[in-house]
Amino acid sequence: MQPLSPKHASSRDWLYPALILINTLNGPGFVVLAEAGRQAGALGAVLLVAAFALLATFSARRACAVAREAEAHKIEGGGADLAGPCRTLWGGRGARVAAAACATALLACAVAQIVLCVQLADALEEALVGRRCGVVVRLPSLELTGKAALFYAGCRPAAEPLPAPALEASVGVLLTLALARLARRAEGPRTQGVGFACFCLGAWRWGAYLRRETVADRAVAWLGPSPLAAAPAVCFNFACVLAVPPLALRGQAEAAARGAGAACLFMALAYAAVAVLGAGGAPTAPSADALLATGRASDLAAVFFLFVSQLAAIPTYLAGADGLIKAHLVAADARRADALAAAAAWGLAIAAHESELFVSIVNWTSLLLLGFTNFSLPLVLDVAWGHPGLAGEACPVALRRLSRALASLTVAGFAALVCREAGAPWFVVAAVAGAAAGSPLPAGRMPRSDSRDSVV
């Protein structure tokens, strides 16, 4: 994720940031977009995708500008994440709170990415050999007799459920772990390019399957029965802003902003296509199960391509969490921070890949953590830092007004979603949202100086 130095800058510097962000956008939510299309309808899904794509693009551009400004001011913590600029507004405690929220969001994204990879690998193993192999550790329970083994390794039929309560390190877990470590060591344009190519192939085959399964005599609903129910899945698919600040350093703010815009546009088109195809089809199983059930070699290959494509984003999420932990939360060297983030992500993934916790991670991180760290925080920082330009220039008045309006809107939406998930009645949700929207933003708290035009 290291940006190029200014002396190596070229007109194509935006391609590498675009590849990285496309691979982070290519996440677990992609496999449920067909269901989102059925919930929101064809037009509703397209409008949701377009709205979140525009919001993510704007937030990413503002995050690039804030990162450049923080680097120019040489603030403590730097501009490599969104927590560093918070230090100038709310002090060290505020920076640590922001770092904890951002690190948790990144780890949640990593867990969801790992879980999807494991599920795809396990599904491939079951389709090819008809069984699942691995190491199982049974957890203590009242049902566990003294003769039952606490630890065993072997294979079981694909239809046989995992004996509960237990944790399983399946072949899918071990394969995902090995390939993710390899991808992190070989991080670079080639790794990201392979992930992008595999995503294109897998998405094409998934779209072809949806087209085959579309009910010919069924009228496509322009507006589905529950459009808002599709919002969490669509929101989760645009969780890329946290990966933007490291790409905007050392004079690469404009290239990173262009790359973010290209990534959001490309993935918005892919998301909209899948959602529209899903809106016209019958309810399907999750993508891996649906594709493997056909028995076609091309569909088996599609699952493999989707599996490989998901691996490219795991190092990006873990590297971002590592940096936040090391810079703001724990006084540890890079190796210890790396181990802490990796252990947390992989431990949760092993525990969650056979449970409903996976769905909970997607829903809660969409509504709470990602709603705050991916949209609200970058826009609030943009307002507080005086709307810096990508190249040190003054921001247009219209852009400043838009940033302030979106900052208030996202803060109000975040507060309303917290209250809604807590079970508050609608009038409490409305009151909290109104109060949040009307609360003053921390504008002008960052002193501007002539040094803003310099880049470290």
What are these regions (language model features)?
Residues 35-40, 125-126, 157-162, 185-195, ...:
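Transmembrane helix-loop boundary segments of multi-pass membrane transporters
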Residues 16-24, 81-84, 100, 125-183, ...:
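Transmembrane alpha-helical segments of multi-pass small-molecule transport proteins
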Residues 44, 352-456:
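A generic transmembrane alpha-helix motif of multi-pass inner-membrane proteins
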Residues 4-10, 133-258, 266-269, 278-294:
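Helix-loop-helix junctions that connect adjacent transmembrane segments
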Residues 75-92, 265-312, 331:
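TM-loop-TM module centered on a large, flexible mid-protein loop between adjacent transmembrane helices
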Residues 57-73, 77-154, 302-327, 375:
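Hydrophobic transmembrane alpha-helices that form the core helical bundles
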Residues 1-35, 39, 56-61, 76, ...:
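Membrane-interface "cap" regions at the ends of multi-pass membrane proteins
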Residues 114, 119-126, 180-183, 194-220, ...:
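Hydrophobic alpha-helical segments and their helix-loop junctions in multi-pass secondary transporters
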